[in-house]
């Protein structure tokens, strides 16, 4: 919206200035022809007035322009066969055929085609192979550093996979929390039914592209009961890459970061029209012009605080700048996530659930538990012990956070090094910076890890984009830290523990 003003008057035979009524017409062919109908993209423009000797203010408003995206990933998504219908959405928890039976659930669902989708109101991976997966939220281990029964938004232990079957959990409405592509997911609905019903949404063929969204289920008091990550991508995440670590243990790693979106350039054509103001025999022409533009983003992904299930918004991949995101009203922003003191322990985890788009600003994170991302874990050392996926794991179906030792093969020593010959890989200094790490000692295949920086806990800002990489593992370090992969162009630390749980890092999941 931009202001404009009109001054329209005439002098009568006595030299007195009088208001002269005026009208406006439009031309989109540079004045060859004129019409009383304004162009469709000019959504508000006052086309007549009574006139006056002083300027009368008005506003001209244009519609949001849809850009042209020539990305091959967008083309692939648009050309994919649509799934589901408005009446029968494709059930994302049914990996067989999208039918009504809930088979396997997760906190993240991957969408690779336009269509109508749904998912049940289930805590994370609490359903597995059509049955209750109690090991996702209960362990026989006890102790002050062990969460024996994982909790929900009320602070009570989860007693049933289906949210509505837990005391004090009554779903009432579904709502978008944020999305990083305009209209990526639309028509979000809560549908009451057995076991609490489901959430459905639409991914339109016209607006589909790689992107991320978070959808929450709320009660009648507007409390978030749980939330889920929708990752739209054409990437076949099942094309895993086998990585052998320093201990000679093999892991099948997701080919890209969780929530990854590739480089993209969106262009916006110029829009213009002439406006002719006429009062009596006099006229004047002006041009309304919206200049052409292009928006470039580099590869990007959401960030995660250790032990937490919900993604925090990405950078734009170019610098320490946020990717544009959209709230439930469609309002765009590049602001940082809000931050808040979530306290610690059970209170912290409750707040993680209740406020999925707010960062814990206390450096220690939960400051309590060793098993948030591996339910039976009791130790603070990096190892190759099996990770038992929990309801707080952010990974999609079939994937989980990797164990602490997963990245040790990225150096010849299994540990920290600043000696280039001891780094098993080559640094990419192209527009998308990062390490192409060798997957084993044969050096015949690589896996790429972008230097995508981190999100700082105290103010939510992104930092170190294109210079450093940080990737969480499921392994805690002595409270309040966690084990993670760190690298720059000159150094690789596969077992770093110097940062705190509340910092937002990337996640590279491994296959279950």
Predicted features, each with a name:
Residues 188-192, 222-224:
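Mobile, glycine-rich extracellular loop/lid and propeptide segments
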Residues 194-210:
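Extracellular/luminal low-complexity segments enriched in Ser/Thr/Pro
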Residues 1-187, 241-281:
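Solvent-exposed, low-complexity, repeat-rich "mucin-like" stalks and linkers
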Residues 209-220:
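A short beta-strand micro-motif common to beta-rich folds, especially ectodomain repeats
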Residues 233-322, 364-365, 371-373:
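An acidic-aromatic substrate-binding cleft motif
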Residues 344-346, 350-512:
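C-terminal, surface-exposed recognition/capping segments
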Residues 60-61, 69-75, 116-189, 290-387:
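Long, low-complexity, polar/charged, intrinsically disordered or flexibly structured peripheral segments
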Residues 221-227, 232:
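Short, exposed coil/turn segments at beta-strand boundaries within extracellular/luminal domains
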């Amino acid at each position: 919206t931009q202001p404009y003003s009109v001054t329209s008057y005439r002098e009568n035979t006595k030299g007195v200035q009088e208001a002269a009524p005026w009208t406006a017409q439009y031309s989109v062919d540079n004045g060859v022809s004129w019409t009383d109908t304004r162009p469709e993209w000019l959504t508000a423009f006052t086309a007549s007035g009574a006139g006056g000797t002083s300027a009368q203010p008005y506003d001209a408003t244009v519609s949001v322009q849809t850009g042209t995206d020539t990305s091959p990933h967008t083309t692939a998504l648009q050309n994919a066969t649509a799934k589901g219908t408005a009446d029968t959405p494709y059930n994302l928890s049914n990996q067989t055929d999208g039918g009504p039976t809930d088979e396997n659930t997760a906190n993240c669902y991957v969408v690779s085609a336009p269509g109508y989708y749904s998912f049940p109101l289930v805590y994370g991976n609490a359903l597995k192979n059509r049955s209750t997966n109690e090991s996702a939220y209960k362990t026989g281990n006890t102790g002050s550093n062990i969460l024996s029964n994982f909790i929900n938004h009320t602070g009570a232990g989860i007693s049933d996979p289906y949210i509505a079957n837990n005391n004090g959990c009554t779903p009432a409405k579904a709502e978008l929390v944020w999305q990083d592509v305009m209209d990526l997911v639309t028509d979000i609905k809560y549908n009451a039914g057995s076991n609490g019903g489901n959430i459905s949404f639409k991914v339109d063929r016209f607006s589909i592209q790689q992107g991320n969204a978070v959808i929450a289920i709320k009660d009648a008091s507007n409390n978030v009961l749980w939330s889920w990550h929708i990752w739209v991508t054409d990437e076949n995440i099942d094309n895993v890459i086998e990585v052998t670590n320093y201990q000679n243990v093999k892991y099948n790693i997701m080919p890209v970061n969780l929530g990854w979106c590739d480089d993209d350039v969106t262009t916006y054509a110029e829009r213009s029209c002439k406006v002719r103001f006429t009062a009596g025999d006099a006229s004047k022409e002006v041009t309304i012009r919206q200049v052409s533009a292009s928006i470039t983003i580099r590869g990007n992904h959401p960030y995660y605080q250790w032990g937490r299930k919900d993604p925090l918004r990405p950078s734009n991949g170019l610098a320490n700048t946020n990717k544009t995101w959209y709230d439930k009203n469609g309002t765009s922003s590049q602001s940082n996530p809000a931050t808040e003191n979530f306290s610690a322990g059970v209170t912290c985890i409750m707040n993680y659930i209740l406020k999925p788009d707010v960062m814990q600003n206390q450096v220690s994170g939960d400051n309590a538990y060793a098993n948030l991302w591996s339910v039976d874990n009791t130790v603070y050392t990096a190892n190759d012990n099996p990770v038992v996926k929990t309801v707080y794991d952010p990974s999609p179906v079939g994937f989980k956070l990797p164990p602490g030792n997963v990245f040790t093969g990225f150096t010849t020593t299994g540990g920290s090094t600043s000696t280039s010959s001891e780094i098993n890989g080559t640094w990419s200094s192209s527009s998308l910076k990062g390490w192409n790490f060798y997957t084993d000692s044969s050096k015949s295949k690589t896996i790429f890890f972008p230097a995508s920086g981190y999100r700082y806990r105290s103010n939510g800002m992104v930092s170190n984009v294109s210079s450093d990489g940080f990737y969480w593992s499921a392994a805690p370090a002595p409270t309040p830290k966690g084990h993670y992969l760190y690298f720059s162009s000159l150094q690789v630390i596969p077992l770093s523990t110097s940062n705190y749980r509340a910092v937002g890092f990337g996640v590279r999941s491994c296959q279950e």
